[in-house]
Every structure is written in structure tokens, then in C-alpha cells.
């Protein structure tokens, strides 16, 4: 008999390091890759793996995410085990703390244990909703069952110099976790390669009994916060539970011959920008065109993209770029960029190495370079963005260490 698997996506993250993109939306609802939202990748991973019973746990500025899920991710009403349901924080009342919002990743699940009980799950897959990657969850579940683990953690080998931002595991020869350290300044390396650390991707598969026991035993005394990395996983190891690491690099994706190596946290503006730029190469490391692993999202019913004018010096053209429907390139040039829906670029404008969200208008003779422009921005003719960073800062734009300029949503020039 096929096991009952419940998917839970943690989508309440504030994403403060992604400001100003997260000033009016949560991190999982930030647009990505022309037509998607960041959360779409977690949902697609579940659906492409045959997990169709999904709760999305939301909290911070969830309106944009709520509208996206309700508009684009709906099943019919006749299949009770096929659902994608939003679960907002509801001020759970603790005896010691009173009514509180979600106080961390584990607390979000703890406050909704009744959903797991009502579904009668055998296994619970708890995944982060704010990373860019493909993952065959079914294969991870198979390994979880084969190893007879209580909890399996998706693991990503990463250079030690970068691993301090993540939870880090030490494992034995069979990849059973022997130690878990959450965001330590000097993370340990792998025995076979000291320059690499085994980091947690924030994705877990729990056997239901172990999840219920661990949440109830590890919450005691956690008044400031309650997280899987800080509290639950260390408690599981201390109490002798079988905690297994799952090698993400061995995760098979249908239709993909090369190893599955791509996973991005996109927790900063620079990381987010680079992940978008990863899509535009001839043979991108992260391929969104694999028909055996479709990436679905909300349909907007936009008309096709259009390129007009071809006289000398005034050609509507684009090179090495990705763009959604409704785009009109009217005598402008676009290079190495990712464009959202319903963008209008007027004659003689030059857009280079940019990420433009939906409903942006670029005036004549404007020049945009290494910029992220949020939704509903009308750029006047002759405007330069990303060319003079001092002037960009004077206008209140964010300029990152690498020189990426961010124009906030609905900015008025």
C-alpha cells in the first residue's frame, strides 16, 4: 500500500536581506525567472514527485502569496487528497506565553499538528519555500524508508567558506548524522574533503511518530523561538533518534542527464540577481525547459511577446534573454536580461543584464544596467539606472556590494 505523505511548505519568511523586494511581500512570493514566484519551485517539486496533499504555512506579509496560490494553484473539488491549502498564523495560545504567532520553523508545524493528525500521514515532508532548485522528493522518501530513519535531512556539500550561513552536519560512513551545528563561524569539513561542509537545505522528511514525539519533547523551555535546526534536530540526536542525511547531488531528475547540483538560497539581493542570470546562458545550469519536470505557475493570459521596428539604430531586439508574455520591445535593445509580464521598452532604450518585474515601462533613450526593477514602475525617457551609482543612491535606490541597483515597487520618478 502506498504510504500517505503530507507536504508542508514553510512560507512565512520575512527575507529582510532581500529588501526592498520584500518590503511589501514575503520572500517566497518574490517574482523570479520572468513568470514564477520563488515558492513555485517547492510546489513543483512536490507535485512532480507525486505529493499532491500540501499545506503552505504563511505569516509575514502574505497577501501577495495568498493571491498567487489562490489564483494559480487549485485542484478540483472531487479529490479530497489533492489540495494546496494556505495556513496562516492564527495566534496559537500557549499556557506560558499566551497567544503568539509562529516563532520559528518548528513552531509553525507544532501549531498545526492537528492537520497532520486529520490527514493521518505516515510521513511528513517539511520543505522550505524560499529556495531555487529541483528535487525529486519521491527518491528522498525512498531512501528515508530504506534506511529506517526517523528523520532525513536533505544535504548539500558546500565550500566551508560559505557554510557558516547554514546548519552543518557531520555524518558517518553511511551518512547517518552524528552531529548538527546551526550556523557556526567555523563549520567542520567533510572527512574525505576538508574544504567542503555538509550543509542542511532546510528540507526534512519525518516519520510521523518521530515528528510528533520530537515536537512535544523539544518545545519545552523554548520561549524565544522554536526551530528545526536550533532545537528539534539536536534533540533528536541527543535522544538517540535515527537522523539520516540525504545527498542532494544524487537526487535524480527525470529528463536531466547531468547530476543535480543546482540549489540557491537567494537570501540576498546579489544571490537573487545571480540566480536569475543563471537562466539566460545557452546551456543554463538551472534548466527551466525540461518537459519531464514541468515548472507550473499561475496563468496570467498575457498576449505573446512582440518585437517591432528594424530600421538602422532602431531595432526591436533581444539577445541571451528570458521574457514572459505581454512584452513589447519597440525599437529597444535587450541583452542578458530577465523580463516579466507586460513590459514595454520604447525606441532606443538599452536594457543590459537586468531583471524587470511585471508592468514596467522603459522610456526612449533610457539605459538600464545591472538593475532589478520591481513592479509598476514607469521609467521616464532618457533615464539612466546602474550607470552612476552615486546618483542611484541619491534617488533612494539600493546599491549592493557587487553594484546591482534595485528600484522599489511603484517608484515614482
From Swiss-Prot:
Keyword field contains Transport: no
UniProt-listed GO biological process terms: glycogen biosynthetic process
Enzyme Commission code(s) on record: 2.7.7.27
PROSITE patterns, A to Z: ADP_GLC_PYROPHOSPH_1 (PS00808), ADP_GLC_PYROPHOSPH_2 (PS00809)
Keywords: ATP-binding, Carbohydrate metabolism, Glycogen biosynthesis, Glycogen metabolism, Nucleotide-binding, Nucleotidyltransferase, Transferase
Residues at which alpha-D-glucose 1-phosphate binds: 102, 167, 182-183, 200
Pfam families associated with the record: Hexapep_GlmU, NTP_transferase
Gene Ontology MF, one: ATP binding
InterPro entries on file: ADP-Glc_PPase, ADP_Glu_pyroP_CS, GlgC_bac, GlmU/GlgC-like_hexapep, NTP_transferase_dom, Nucleotide-diphossugar_trans, Trimer_LpxA-like_sf
Catalytic activity from the UniProt record: alpha-D-glucose 1-phosphate + ATP + H(+) = ADP-alpha-D-glucose + diphosphate
CDD domains documented for this protein: ADP_Glucose_PP, LbH_G1P_AT_C
Primary enzyme class: transferase
Pathway assigned in UniProt: Glycan biosynthesis; glycogen biosynthesis
Function: Involved in the biosynthesis of ADP-glucose, a building block required for the elongation reactions to produce glycogen. Catalyzes the reaction between ATP and alpha-D-glucose 1-phosphate (G1P) to produce pyrophosphate and ADP-Glc.
Family recorded in the similarity comment: Belongs to the bacterial/plant glucose-1-phosphate adenylyltransferase family.
Record-linked HAMAP family: GlgC
Subunit structure: Homotetramer.
Designated name of the protein: Glucose-1-phosphate adenylyltransferase
Organism: Deinococcus deserti (strain DSM 17065 / CIP 109153 / LMG 22923 / VCD115)
Amino acid at each position: 500500500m502506498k504510504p500517505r505523505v503530507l507536504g508542508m511548505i514553510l512560507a512565512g519568511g520575512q527575507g529582510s536581506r532581500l529588501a526592498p523586494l520584500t518590503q511589501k511581500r514575503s520572500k517566497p512570493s518574490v517574482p523570479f525567472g520572468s513568470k514564477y514566484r520563488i515558492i513555485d519551485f517547492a510546489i513543483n517539486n512536490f507535485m512532480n514527485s507525486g505529493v499532491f496533499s500540501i499545506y503552505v504555512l504563511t505569516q509575514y506579509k502574505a497577501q501577495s502569496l495568498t493571491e498567487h496560490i489562490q489564483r494559480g494553484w487549485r485542484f478540483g473539488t472531487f479529490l479530497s487528497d489533492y489540495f494546496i491549502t494556505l495556513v496562516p498564523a492564527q495566534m496559537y495560545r500557549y499556557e506560558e506565553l499566551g497567544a503568539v504567532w509562529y516563532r520559528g520553523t518548528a513552531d509553525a508545524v507544532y501549531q498545526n499538528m492537528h492537520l497532520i493528525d486529520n490527514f493521518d500521514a505516515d510521513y511528513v515532508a517539511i520543505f522550505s519555500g524560499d529556495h531555487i532548485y529541483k528535487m525529486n522528493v519521491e527518491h528522498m522518501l525512498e531512501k528515508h524508508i530504506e534506511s529506517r530513519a526517523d528523520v532525513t535531512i536533505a544535504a548539500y556539500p558546500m565550500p566551508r567558506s560559505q557554510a557558516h550561513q547554514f546548519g552543518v552536519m557531520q555524518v558517518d560512513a553511511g551518512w547517518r548524522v552524528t552531529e548538527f551545528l546551526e550556523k557556526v563561524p567555523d563549520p567542520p569539513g567533510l572527512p574525505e574533503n576538508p574544504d567542503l561542509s555538509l550543509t542542511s537545505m532546510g528540507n526534512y522528511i519525518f516519520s510521523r511518530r518521530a515528528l510528533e514525539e520530537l515536537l512535544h519533547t523539544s518545545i519545552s523551555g523554548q520561549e524565544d523561538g522554536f526551530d528545526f535546526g536550533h532545537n528539534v534536530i539536536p534533540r533528536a540526536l541527543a535522544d538517540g533518534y535515527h537522523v539520516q542525511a540525504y545527498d542532494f547531488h544524487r537526487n535524480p531528475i527525470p529528463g536531466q542527464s547531468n547530476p543535480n547540483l543546482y540549489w540557491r538560497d537567494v537570501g540576498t539581493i546579489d544571490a537573487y540577481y545571480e540566480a536569475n542570470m543563471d537562466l539566460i546562458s545557452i546551456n543554463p545550469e538551472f534548466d527551466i525547459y525540461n518537459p519531464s519536470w514541468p515548472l507550473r505557475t499561475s496563468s496570467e493570459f498575457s498576449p505573446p511577446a512582440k518585437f517591432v521596428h528594424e530600421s538602422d539604430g532602431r531595432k526591436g531586439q533581444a539577445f541571451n534573454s528570458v521574457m514572459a508574455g505581454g512584452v513589447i520591445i519597440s525599437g529597444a535593445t535587450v541583452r542578458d536580461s530577465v523580463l516579466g509580464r507586460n513590459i514595454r521598452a520604447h525606441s532606443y532604450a538599452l536594457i543590459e543584464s537586468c531583471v524587470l518585474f511585471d508592468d514596467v515601462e522603459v522610456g526612449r533613450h533610457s539605459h538600464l544596467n545591472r538593475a532589478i526593477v520591481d513592479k509598476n514602475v514607469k521609467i521616464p525617457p532618457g533615464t539612466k539606472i546602474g550607470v552612476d551609482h552615486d546618483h542611484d543612491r541619491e534617488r533612494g535606490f539600493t546599491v549592493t556590494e557587487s553594484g546591482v541597483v534595485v528600484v522599489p515597487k511603484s517608484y515614482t520618478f
